[in-house]
């Protein structure tokens, strides 16, 4: 039955439903029979509703003439599942049915959507990932193991992978366990044909083996555990077995293994015997690690830097900027920055030890990350020669290293906590009692041996120069001055014991000093030069005039900066001023936020330098 004819019949008499139609309303009997409600099935009713979907008023009138059960059957057929709307009345059901019929053409019934989803699921392929949670690389259909993290021989991976225990092919990128490569002779490790090289187990091409050997020796040299030392030496000896070109390296390995076996027995059973012993407790531990160092140096002489894995990185220049009794300031620079990212330096590790000590601690004193190049090492002993080793490193590992020697200044004071002043040997600096003859006759001796201990550069200050400095101090201390209407706060210092009398007669006296008398003395103390101080004062004054800081902060800041600021604080202030010079508002906020706490704390400079006439002392 055509939908158009049904629509025309319904519009002819809107009060007559399909069940009330008689034969007089139609011209042909076929149309009469098909319009009767008993003859129309669910699919024909759906076609009729879809034909009237563009005419919602006529469709609503037609649906109102049908029973609730007939409408429910059409809704269930449209949705593709059985539903029971017991709580909805007939008008609401008609509204839901019209909404279902008026859906866009792309939205078919739920059954159609379900079938399309099943087809999509069947079309989606599954991706096989590596079982290693740290890798999770996608594997091909023909891959039996992950070439990214698994061994190409045993096809297993390590949960905590140590790259020094793996052999990697430069051609195909495959890798294998070092132990797996040593078990089979067909990979060429220790053969006469390949001296210092090995065959890749995956592609068969030969690769360098000395880089892996150097890693074993380096770990053995730096480790503190006996089990690690034994294991790495055993691997280093196996990697060079049968060699003729590197016979001297093998002899050093044999000697180290022989000495170690004298303490722990055969290396095959070291794990059960020694467990996790300490290398320093072995009688041969230090000597064995020295042999490892000699083996690494011998390899560097034989193999060119391009062939060695630990090729030297950028050239370093290490110089000592300031030496005091208990600290030293070191600057490390890279002269020739490397263009390749592989050898690009990330930072430097500083290891400081006494020259008489044979070995350096495995933990560095400090680490300097670029672009920072200056570092201070604290806690040194006065009048002692030290050896400083600087090692450059990047993400791959250590690159280059350099050593120099220096000697700290003498500290004649009784208190070990005070640092040495660069102008006098006394621990109390220029604040010591000038009436004592010992203070007037002290000489300054400053020595530093640079460049691997080749030469000692010694500077001497005569007694006359020191005496002139003390004479200037006497003139300064007799005068008192006020800073912006307020007296300078008296800062008590530690006591000096008078050495001329038995029983230690201790005297203290208070004094106040003018800041305008000798500004250059304080400038030498905290590292603020005349030009730098003038530039900072002008900048702070400009900040006050533009309203970025108030008068109170300006007074406190300039007093603190010129009298109590340390070398590091002075350097930070200079960096802030140079960086935020074009943005004075940000500069003012940064200075207030960074130095407010330091300004309020009434401490003196902690760099060991006591400015003349500034550190006030009481004498009884």
Swiss-Prot record:
Pfam families from the UniProt entry: Fn3_VIN3, PHD_Oberon, VIN3_C
One GO term describing the cellular component: nucleus
Motif (Nuclear localization signal): 213-220, 493-500
Annotated ranges, domain Fibronectin type-III: 314-412
Phenotype when the gene is knocked out: Impaired vernalization response with incomplete repression of FLC during and after cold exposure, due to a reduction in vernalization-induced histone H3 deacetylation and methylation (e.g. H3K4me3 and H3K27me3).
SUPFAM superfamilies, A to Z: Fibronectin type III (SSF49265)
Coiled-coil regions listed: none
Localization (cell): Nucleus; Nucleus speckle
PROSITE patterns, A to Z: FN3 (PS50853)
Alphabetical GO biological process terms: cellular response to cold; negative regulation of gene expression, epigenetic; response to cold; response to hypoxia; vernalization response
Region VIN3-Interacting Domain (VID): start-end pairs: 512-620
Induction note: By cold. Expressed only after a duration of cold exposure that is effective for vernalization. Strongly down-regulated after return to a warm growth temperature.
Keyword annotations: DNA-binding, Metal-binding, Nucleus, Repressor, Stress response, Transcription, Transcription regulation, Zinc, Zinc-finger
A single MF term (Gene Ontology): DNA binding
Transmembrane annotation, as ranges: none
Zinc fingers typed PHD-type, residue spans: 148-206
Major localisation: nucleus
This protein's record includes keyword DNA-binding: yes
Tissue-by-tissue expression: Expressed in shoot and root apices. Displays the same pattern of expression as FLC.
Entry function: Plays a central role in vernalization by mediating the initial transcriptional repression of the homeotic gene FLC, a floral repressor, after a cold treatment. However, due to its transient expression, it cannot maintain repression of FLC, which is then maintained by Polycomb Group complexes containing VRN2 throughout development. Required to deacetylate histones on the FLC promoter. Together with VIL1, required during vernalization for the modifications of FLC and FLM chromatin that are associated with an epigenetically silenced state (e.g.
Self-association state and partner proteins as the record states: Interacts with VIL1 and VIL2. The heterodimer made of VIN3 and VIL1 is required for establishing the vernalization-induced epigenetic silencing of FLC. Component of the plant homeodomain / polycomb repressive complex 2 (PHD-PRC2) large complex during prolonged cold, composed of core PRC2 components (VRN2, EZA1, FIE and MSI1), and three related PHD finger proteins (VIL1, VIL2 and VIN3) that mediates histone H3 trimethylation on 'Lys-27' (H3K27me3).
Identification of the protein by name: Protein VERNALIZATION INSENSITIVE 3
Organism: Arabidopsis thaliana (Mouse-ear cress)
Encoding gene, per UniProt annotation: VIN3
């Amino acid at each position: 039955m055509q939908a158009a004819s049904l629509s025309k019949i319904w519009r002819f008499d809107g009060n007559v439903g399909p069940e009330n139609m008689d034969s007089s309303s139609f011209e042909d009997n076929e149309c009469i029979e098909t319009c009767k409600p008993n003859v129309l099935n669910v699919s024909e009713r759906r076609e009729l509703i879809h034909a009237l979907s563009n005419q919602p008023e006529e469709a609503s009138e037609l649906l109102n003439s049908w029973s609730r059960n007939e409408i429910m059957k059409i809704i269930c057929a449209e949705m593709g599942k059985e539903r029971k709307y017991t709580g909805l009345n007939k008008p609401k059901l008609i509204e839901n049915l019209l909404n279902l019929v008026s859906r866009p053409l792309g939205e078919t019934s739920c059954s159609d959507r379900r079938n399309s989803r099943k087809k999509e699921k069947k079309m989606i392929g599954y991706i096989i990932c590596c079982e290693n949670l740290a890798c999770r690389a996608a594997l091909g259909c023909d891959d039996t193991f992950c070439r990214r993290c698994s061994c190409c021989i045993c096809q297993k991976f390590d949960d905590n992978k140590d790259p020094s225990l793996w052999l990697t092919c430069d051609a195909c990128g495959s890798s294998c366990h070092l132990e797996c490569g040593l078990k089979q002779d067909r990979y060429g490790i220790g053969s006469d044909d390949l001296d210092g090289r090995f065959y890749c187990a995956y592609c068969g091409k030969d690769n360098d083996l000395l880089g892996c050997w150097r890693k074993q020796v380096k770990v053995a040299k730096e480790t503190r555990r006996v089990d690690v030392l034994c294991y790495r030496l055993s691997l280093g000896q196996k990697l060079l077995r049968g060699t003729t070109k590197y016979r001297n390296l093998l002899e050093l390995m044999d000697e180290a293994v022989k000495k170690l076996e004298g303490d722990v027995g055969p290396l095959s059973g070291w794990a059960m015997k020694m467990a996790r012993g300490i290398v320093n407790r072995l009688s041969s531990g230090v000597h064995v690690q020295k042999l490892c160092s000699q083996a690494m140096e011998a390899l560097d002489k034989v193999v060119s830097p391009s062939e060695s894995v630990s090729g030297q990185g950028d050239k370093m220049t290490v110089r000592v900027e300031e030496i005091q009794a208990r600290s030293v300031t070191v600057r490390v620079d890279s002269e020739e920055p490397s263009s390749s990212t592989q050898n690009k330096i990330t930072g430097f590790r500083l290891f400081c030890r006494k020259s008489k000590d044979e070995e350096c601690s495995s933990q560095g004193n400090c680490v300097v990350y670029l672009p920072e190049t200056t570092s201070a090492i604290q806690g040194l002993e006065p009048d002692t020669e030290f050896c400083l080793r600087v090692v450059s490193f990047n993400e791959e590992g250590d690159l280059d290293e350099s050593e120099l020697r220096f000697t700290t200044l003498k500290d004649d004071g009784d208190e070990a906590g005070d640092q040495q002043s660069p102008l006098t040997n006394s621990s109390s600096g220029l604040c010591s009692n000038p009436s004592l003859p010992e203070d007037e006759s002290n000489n300054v001796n400053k020595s530093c041996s640079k460049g691997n201990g080749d030469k000692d550069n010694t500077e001497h200050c005569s007694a006359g120069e020191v005496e002139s400095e003390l004479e200037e101090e006497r003139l300064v201390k007799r005068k008192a001055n006020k800073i912006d209407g307020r007296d300078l706060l008296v800062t008590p210092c530690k006591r000096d014991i008078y050495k001329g009398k038995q029983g230690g007669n201790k005297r203290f006296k208070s004094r106040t000093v003018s800041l305008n008398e000798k500004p250059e003395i304080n400038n030498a103390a905290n590292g603020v030069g005349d030009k730098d101080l003038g530039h900072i004062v002008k900048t702070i004054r400009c900040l006050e005039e533009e309203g970025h800081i108030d008068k109170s902060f300006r007074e406190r800041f300039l007093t603190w900066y010129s009298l109590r600021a340390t070398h590091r604080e002075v350097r930070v202030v200079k960096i802030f001023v140079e960086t935020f010079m074009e943005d004075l508002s940000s500069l003012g906020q940064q200075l207030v936020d960074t130095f407010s706490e330091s300004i309020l704390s009434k401490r003196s400079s902690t760099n060991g330098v006591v400015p003349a006439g500034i550190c006030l002392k009481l004498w009884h």
